[in-house]
Curated annotation (Swiss-Prot):
Intrachain disulfide bonds: C79-C127
GO molecular function: cytokine activity; growth factor activity; interleukin-2 receptor binding
Main subcellular location of this protein, as a coarse class: secreted
Function: Cytokine produced by activated CD4-positive helper T-cells and to a lesser extend activated CD8-positive T-cells and natural killer (NK) cells that plays pivotal roles in the immune response and tolerance. Binds to a receptor complex composed of either the high-affinity trimeric IL-2R (IL2RA/CD25, IL2RB/CD122 and IL2RG/CD132) or the low-affinity dimeric IL-2R (IL2RB and IL2RG). Interaction with the receptor leads to oligomerization and conformation changes in the IL-2R subunits resulting in downstream signaling starting with phosphorylation of JAK1 and JAK3.
Protein name: Interleukin-2
Cellular location(s): Secreted
GO cellular component: extracellular space
Lineage: Eukaryota, Metazoa, Chordata, Craniata, Vertebrata
Glycosylated position list: T23
Any Pfam family matching the protein: IL2
Stretch forming the signal peptide: 1-20
The family this protein is said to belong to: Belongs to the IL-2 family.
Key words, A-Z: Adaptive immunity, Cytokine, Disulfide bond, Glycoprotein, Growth factor, Immunity, Secreted, Signal
GO biological process: one example: adaptive immune response
Length: 155
């Protein structure tokens, strides 16, 4: 008889403890910080590309990039590294007084490190790409929007 009351008491205690626990775990906060860093780096790249003094912009817009279909989850970030090498090569066409090669290299390195942290060692994800290609500005804007969307679901 007392055994049942004791088990009920333990169950209620566990429910109370679980409900009063903080809702944002440290891993979620870390993911948010990494997404913020990725967003910042992607925006800096976009600003460098869209710089009104960039004489190579029209040439850069001729290169086409692939974006994933319906990117809605954090795992879709695994599709980004596949296009980063081309992105880096295209960005090297555009160095100017406001967007130096060292800046490009540093931003690309930051993005690669951040992506590695965010996606972890998971490599089984198969990317499905959209049939339509994107220009460099569309590509960066889509990834910025994706990161903002994921970030908003974490907050």
């Amino acid at each position: 008889m007392y055994k049942m009351q004791l088990l009920s008491c333990i169950a209620l205690t566990l429910v109370l403890v679980a409900n009063s626990a903080p809702t944002t775990s440290s891993s979620t906060k870390e993911t948010q910080q990494q997404l913020e860093q990725l967003l910042l780096d992607l925006r800096l790249l976009l600003n460098g590309v869209n710089n009104y003094e960039n004489p190579q912009l029209s040439r850069m817009l001729t290169f086409k990039f692939y974006t994933p279909k319906k990117a809605t989850e954090l795992t879709h970030l695994q599709c980004l590294p596949e296009e980063l090498k081309l992105l880096e090569e295209v960005l090297y066409l555009a160095p100017n007084k406001n967007f130096h090669l060292t800046d490009i290299k540093e931003l690309m390195s930051n993005i690669n490190v951040t992506l590695l942290k965010l996606k972890g060692s998971e490599t089984r994800f198969k990317c499905e790409y959209d049939d339509e290609t994107a220009t460099i500005t569309e590509f960066l804007n889509k990834w910025i929007t994706f990161c903002q969307s994921i970030f908003s679901t974490l907050t």
